[in-house]
Amino acid sequence: MKSERVNYPVKLLNFILSIMNSYLFVLIVSIGFAESSSPKSSTSCSLMTSCAVEKCLDRGMVGRIITESSRDEVFGNLVEKFDMVCIAAKCGNECSQCKHCHYALEQMSALAQGEKTSGLCPKLETCVFNCLTEDVSKVLSCVATRCNVHCYDGDCPSCKMISRRIFSNICKQHSMTTQPQIKYEGTCPNLFMELADDYVAMKKKKL
């Protein structure tokens, strides 16, 4: 990743942060996972996950995505609704107690200001940084088409773990495994892993 700082005007920084709220979830929840194995951290992150699903994902919208999306589309349609800005605003206490959520906000700020991040998820971080430096006005579509996949392709296991927790919570609430277009006999976490692999394969075909 480039180490030099890129200076953006303040208004542009605010614009960057506002439009990156959903797609950068896959990056910013991923940092600090190495410290998240303690019981206290795990419990705190579970509270953050529950809060995120309750306050930052409209239940009706999620239900429509699950019932109206094809099996091939449901995963992407869901994970692209994960909103870190909302989590920071509405689940601030829970986020501050979850190390990789709290630290993630600092990483998002660093990215938006063109500063070097921790480098724990090299492909994902480099991809987002490149989207910012290439054309900030198109950063949303750039991150969606080029970077989102790195949360699930093995580059960033911590990102995949957090996404799996949120997905599994939603899956259980909405009985996803029994949906006619899904028809999955296993558990929600296993469904996540299968759909994530399919998502990566589909994304790579489009690149």
UniProtKB/Swiss-Prot annotation:
UniProt GO BP: defense response to Gram-negative bacterium
Keywords tagged on the record: Membrane, Transmembrane, Transmembrane helix
Function in brief: Acts downstream of daf-16/foxo to suppress tumors induced by disruption of gld-1. Potentially a direct target of daf-15/foxo.
Keyword Transit peptide appears in the UniProt entry: no
Annotated membrane topology: Single-pass membrane protein
Matches recorded under Pfam families: DUF5332
Subcellular localization: Membrane
PANTHER family with a match to the protein in the record: PROTEIN DCT-5, PROTEIN DCT-5-RELATED
InterPro entries: DUF5332
Cellular component GO terms, alphabetical: membrane
Protein's UniProt name: Protein dct-5
TM region positions: 13-33
Organism domain of life: Eukaryota
